[in-house]
Amino acid sequence: MKQVRLHESLRALFYTPYYAALERGGHEKEGLDVILSQPSGPNRAASDLFDGYADVTWGGPMRMLQHMNQDPEPDRRLIAFAEAVARDPFVLVGNKPRLDFRFDDLRECRLATVSEVPTPWMCLQEDLRRAGIDPGEIDRVTDKSMSENADALREGKVDVIQVFEPFVQSLINEGVGHVWYAAASRGLTSYTTYYAPISYCRQERDTLLGLTRALYRTQTWLHAASSSEIAATVHKYFPELSAPVLEGAIAHYRKLAVWGRDPRLAKTGFLRLKMALISGDFIKRDTPYEECVDPSIAEAVMAER
C-alpha cells in the first residue's frame, strides 16, 4: 500500500465527498493508505505541504492562489487536480423571512460575516460589487465566529449572518433563521479541490490518479444515494449533530448543487473565485488557470469509464 498523508484544511460538512471517499474504501481499492490529518490552522494548509507535514491537501484554491501570490517561484507551485466542491456553500441567514431578497437590502442591515476563513466574504463582496454596491457601505461584524454570530442572530443583535451548514439547518429548525441568499446560486465558484506541490505531482502521478478515481466513484455514488445514506456514511466526522440536522444539511447542499458530479475543476469556477480575491485585494497576482490546475488527471480518470 502506498501511504498518502492527506490534510483537510478544517472540519466542514461541505467536504462530505472527501469524507465519503475515505469511508467507502475507495482509496484502498487503489492501493492507497490514506492518513488524514489537519494543519495547525487553515492558513497553514498550503505551507505544510512544503514543510513536510502532508503530501496532498484538500481545500480552497484560494490557498493556492495566496501561496503563489506570495511565492511565485515555478518550482514551488501548487497544482490542483480533483475538485469536489464546485459552488459556494455559504448562506445568508436572516432573522425574518425575505423571499424577495436583493443585495441592496443589506444596506439597511447589520451583517455578521465569516471570520474563520477569508473566501466567503471575498466572494460575497464580489457579488455586491457586481450588484453596484460598495462593500464598504455595509454595516458589518467581522471579528466573531460563526457560532457566535448564530447566537447573535438568536439574540437579535444582528439582522443577517453568513454561515455554512449545519448552522443553516439548525437555525431553520429552531424557527429563528430564514434563508435570504444561497451563494451557490451565483453559479460555479471553485471552492474545494485536492492540490499538491508540483514536485509531488510530477513524481506521484499514479497516486494522484488513484485519489481521483476514488473521488470520482464517490461522486457518482453521492448523486445516486439518499441523503440519509450519505449522512450515515459521514456521521463519524460530525458526532455532535443529530440525524435530522445532518440529513437536512446534506439535502440542502444537494439541492443547491454544491457538489460536483465529476472531479474536473472548471475554468469558469476558477476565474470567478480569482476575480473575487483580486477585487477584494486579497491577492495581487493574476495567476493563470494553466499555472495551477492540471485537468489531465481528472480527464484521464473520466476517460477510463
Please place each PLM-identified region on the residue numbering:
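Pocket-lining segment of extracytoplasmic ligand-binding domains
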Residues: K96, E148, A152-F238
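Conserved C-terminal helix/tail region of periplasmic/extracytoplasmic solute-binding proteins
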Residues: M275-R305
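Short amphipathic alpha-helical segments at helix boundaries and their inter-helical linkers
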Residues: A54, W58, R154, Y253-K267, ...
